[in-house]
């Protein structure tokens, strides 16, 4: 029994030892990390959360005070769902360009842009989608929304016809133009990281 307790304590210690860290800009709130809701105990000082090494999926919202007609107002974004790969013990930072007015916030809402970087300030490749929900949004079930998105994504992948393309024959420019904005961003970040 004693050996079992020691082994489980070591396993717990070693998993947090190799964990990656993600520091979020002050206004960014983590809602979901890898399918699970985030509790206050999981958010450490400086708005930092631990991530497992490997593939991660996080849903975040941005809440910021902006000006509208000379008055201060709180802007809350739709959830942004990011997917990326974190290396063991990697320190990552997620930021966005702050907005001053409600018009700036609406522009962000229509075309959200965030920056994921490593400790040296190099961009880290990621994909991002905005989980839009119309109507009143007082109490959102972020776990359910992410689970529904993942189920829909898996269903599309299962039903997509398999197409065999010769990678040498595909023109890179054409492929880039066919990508969504988020895919283009992720591709550019990957390309910058892999420059020779």
Curated annotation (Swiss-Prot):
Keywords: Signal
Signal peptide: 1-19
Highest taxon above the source species: Bacteria
Pfam family, one: DUF2057
InterPro entries (UniProt xref): UPF0319
Family as reported in the entry's similarity comment: Belongs to the UPF0319 family.
Identification of the protein by name: UPF0319 protein VV1_0237
Species name: Vibrio vulnificus (strain CMCP6)
């Amino acid at each position: 029994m004693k050996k079992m307790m020691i082994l489980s304590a070591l396993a717990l210690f070693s998993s947090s030892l190799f964990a990656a860290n993600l520091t979020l800009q002050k206004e960014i709130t983590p809602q979901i990390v890898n399918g699970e809701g985030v509790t206050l105990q999981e958010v450490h000082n400086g708005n930092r959360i631990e991530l497992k090494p490997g593939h991660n999926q996080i849903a975040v919202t941005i809440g910021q005070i902006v000006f509208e007609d000379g008055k201060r107002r709180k802007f809350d974004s739709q959830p942004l769902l990011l997917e990326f790969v974190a290396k063991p013990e990697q320190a990552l930072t997620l930021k966005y360009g702050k907005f001053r007015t409600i018009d700036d916030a609406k522009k962000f809402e229509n075309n959200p842009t965030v920056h994921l970087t490593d400790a040296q300030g190099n961009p880290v490749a990621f994909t991002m989608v905005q989980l839009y929900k119309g109507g009143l949004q007082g109490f959102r079930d972020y776990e359910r929304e992410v689970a529904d998105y993942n189920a829909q994504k898996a269903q599309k992948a299962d039903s997509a016809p398999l197409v065999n393309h010769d990678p040498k024959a595909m023109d890179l420019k054409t492929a880039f133009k066919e990508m969504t904005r988020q895919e283009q961003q992720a591709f550019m970040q990957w390309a910058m990281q892999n420059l020779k």
